[in-house]
Amino acid sequence: MNVNTARTSAVIVHPVPPAYADCYLVWQQSITTAAAQFDGYQGTDIYPPENDRDPNWIAVLHFQTPADLQGWLDSPQRAEILAQLPPELAGYSKTVLPQGFAPWFSQLLHKPPSWKMALTVLLALYPTVLLLNLLITPHLQGLGRAGAVLVGNAIGVALMQWGIMPRLTRLLKPWLSADSDRRFSVLGGAAIVSILLLLAHLFQRWFF
């Protein structure tokens, strides 16, 4: 069993035209291989779009500590690989989850299982990132791509850190703390997955 006390993650949402999906995957493999050479690297999870009308690929990058993650994000190796992206794939948004998931669950008496924390963060992050990309980012284009990404990320992190996650963890506290009640835990997890699928359906219907 691995106990990760300071795991930190970065969520990168990358709009990819369907015709460039193979190109993106080849590029993603190269940047993942490069990241794996850095201290503290713990893996990358890739989530493809739900269908051809949804362009967003999501990569969740995991490092042991915030310093390890920042070392990769600021590295010349990463900058070199980013520069290899064709113009059609150059736009993306990045959100760093500060110091992993644990601080958002610190008000609970017992730390919830990792899968519950991950589901809770995903429930908060998915609509936040999509709404920012749809409603805020288009109005920041005057700042240039780098400036728009910076401002969008700052807004997303602030919303997650001080607005959404504290309220969501309080709302879900009975479920997050119910380690001994397996049935309640499973039903709660299934309910969150159902909500995420419903959100994906609604976003697809309304915006894509």
From Swiss-Prot:
Classify the source by domain of life: Bacteria
User: Which InterPro entries is this protein grouped with?
Assistant: ABM_predict, Dimeric_a/b-barrel
Q: Which SUPFAM superfamilies match?
A: Dimeric alpha+beta barrel (SSF54909)
PANTHER family documented for this protein: SLR1162 PROTEIN (PTHR40057:SF1)
- This one is known as Uncharacterized protein Synpcc7942_2318
- The record lists the organism as Synechococcus elongatus (strain ATCC 33912 / PCC 7942 / FACHB-805) (Anacystis nidulans R2)
